[in-house]
């Protein structure tokens, strides 16, 4: 029988392809077209319960419910919209956890920033998510649901997906890749419009390349490595987990990934005022990028509670960028969005959890 993604003791249909759902219907003693109907209602009509799929025989719907099979949609807990129309959603899982996702609109695109885990074990000093540690990894349906929920809430088709929300995607690599397959095949978001971010996990980049090729064929999504420092000492200060992954080893693995996939790597660099944004740091970063098929994305820090890091001035950001450009580094500056509504990753979720504890 078709293996279904598991939610505790329940099975979720969200995340299955049309072919999988056709096979599922046949195994249930139904015609294969019933599987195609389920697929349409889940991915195009946004069905949230089996009972809402009125084209299915009621007897079969009731039977599926008795078996514990469900669509696997999340429940909205809270939504916040910033002045620039950036949307932040908090959604509840079957086991009472909270997932955070963000919709970032511009005139021509809608980017969904999805979470891959509930919490995060990496402990990056600038990140609100890591303050609470890791609870668990997300299932495929819980990842895909984030994109569908943003689409429904904003009444607009997402064009891009970035795995830059809560969690370390490479610690949930199989579900992330299955989610990418679903996003491309079932929701219609091209692989080139998807970015997977990682802080760097030893001995995983080659595995990612090989697994992605096995699951997706040719790798077309973008790998974004969260570098955030141009030397090992400073990187360990900002990212404690970097102590087990020397920066030279990380860059060596990135070059191997490029060889295996033919895709350039994007390096994320969060600018922390007075800490890693000086001219010498730009020079060191340019030296690291020499000979790399890569791109550097600069991000001005969004302050969070409990940390004393500062957001650099716009003039400092511009000077850092210009130094890199003058050294021949391909560089861009990410526009800050939703700063008036707890935009830093994990902030709204942490505040909500704190309120629940207080009450």
From Swiss-Prot:
Subcellular localization, per the record? Cytoplasm
Please share the entry's free-text remark on the cofactor: Binds 1 [4Fe-4S] cluster. The cluster is coordinated with 3 cysteines and an exchangeable S-adenosyl-L-methionine.
> What are the recorded GO MF terms, alphabetically?
4 iron, 4 sulfur cluster binding; metal ion binding; rRNA (adenine(2503)-C2-)-methyltransferase activity; rRNA binding; tRNA (adenine(37)-C2)-methyltransferase activity; tRNA binding
Tell me a GO cellular component: cytoplasm
What does the entry list as the binding residues for S-adenosyl-L-methionine? 167-168, 197, 226-228, 302
Q: What is this enzyme's EC?
A: 2.1.1.192
Q: What are the disulfide bonds?
A: 113-345
The record's section on InterPro entries has: Aldolase_TIM, Methyltransferase_A, RlmN_N, RNA_MTrfase_RlmN, rRNA_lsu_MTrfase_RlmN/Cfr, rSAM
Indicate the residues that form the catalytic site: 100 (proton acceptor), 345 (s-methylcysteine intermediate)
Domain of life here?
Answer: Bacteria
Domain Radical SAM core residues, every copy: 106-340
What Pfam families has UniProt attached to this entry?
A: Radical_SAM, RlmN_N
PROSITE patterns registered for this protein in UniProt: RADICAL_SAM (PS51918)
The protein's matches in SUPFAM superfamilies, at most eight in alphabetical order, are given as: Radical SAM enzymes (SSF102114)
Q: Which cofactor does it need?
A: [4Fe-4S] cluster
Q: What class of enzyme is it?
A: transferase
Report whether 4Fe-4S shows up as a keyword of the record: yes
Ligand binding ([4Fe-4S] cluster): 120, 124, 127
Tell me what this protein is called. Probable dual-specificity RNA methyltransferase RlmN
Organism of this sequence: Prochlorococcus marinus (strain NATL2A)
């Amino acid at each position: 029988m078709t293996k279904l993604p598991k939610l505790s003791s329940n099975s979720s249909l969200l995340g299955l392809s049309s072919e999988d759902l056709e096979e599922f219907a046949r195994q249930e003693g139904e015609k294969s077209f019933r599987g195609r109907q389920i697929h349409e209602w889940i991915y195009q009509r946004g069905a949230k319960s089996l009972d809402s799929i009125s084209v299915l025989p009621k007897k079969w719907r009731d039977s599926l419910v008795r078996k514990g099979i469900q669509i696997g949609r999340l429940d909205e807990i809270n939504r916040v919209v910033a002045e620039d129309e950036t949307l932040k959603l908090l959604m509840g899982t079957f086991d009472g956890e909270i997932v955070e996702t963000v919709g970032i609109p511009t005139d021509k695109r809608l980017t969904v920033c999805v979470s891959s885990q509930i919490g995060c074990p990496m402990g990056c000093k600038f990140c609100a998510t890591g303050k609470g540690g890791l609870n668990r990894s997300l299932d495929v349906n819980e990842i895909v649901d984030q994109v569908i929920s943003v689409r429904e809430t904003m009444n607009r088709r997402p064009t891009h997906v970035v795995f830059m929300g809560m969690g370390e995607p490479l610690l949930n690599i199989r579900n992330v890749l299955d989610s990418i397959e679903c996003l491309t095949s079932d929701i219609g978001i091209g692989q080139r419009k998807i970015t997977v971010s990682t802080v760097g996990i030893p001995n995983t980049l080659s595995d990612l390349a090989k697994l992605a090729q096995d699951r997706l064929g040719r790798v077309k999504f973008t790998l974004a490595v969260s570098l955030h420092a141009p030397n090992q000492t400073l990187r360990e200060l900002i990212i404690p987990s970097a102590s087990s992954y020397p920066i030279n080893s990380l860059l060596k693995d990135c070059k191997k990934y490029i060889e295996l996939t033919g895709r350039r790597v994007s390096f994320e660099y969060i600018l922390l005022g007075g800490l890693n944004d000086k001219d010498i740091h730009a020079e060191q970063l340019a030296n690291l990028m020499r000979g790399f098929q890569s791109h550097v994305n600069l991000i001005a820090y969004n302050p969070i509670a409990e940390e004393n890091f500062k957001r650099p001035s716009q003039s400092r950001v511009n000077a850092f960028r210009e130094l890199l450009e003058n050294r021949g580094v391909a560089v861009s500056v990410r526009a800050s969005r939703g700063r008036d509504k707890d935009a830093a990753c994990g902030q709204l979720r942490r505040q909500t959890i704190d309120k629940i504890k207080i009450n």
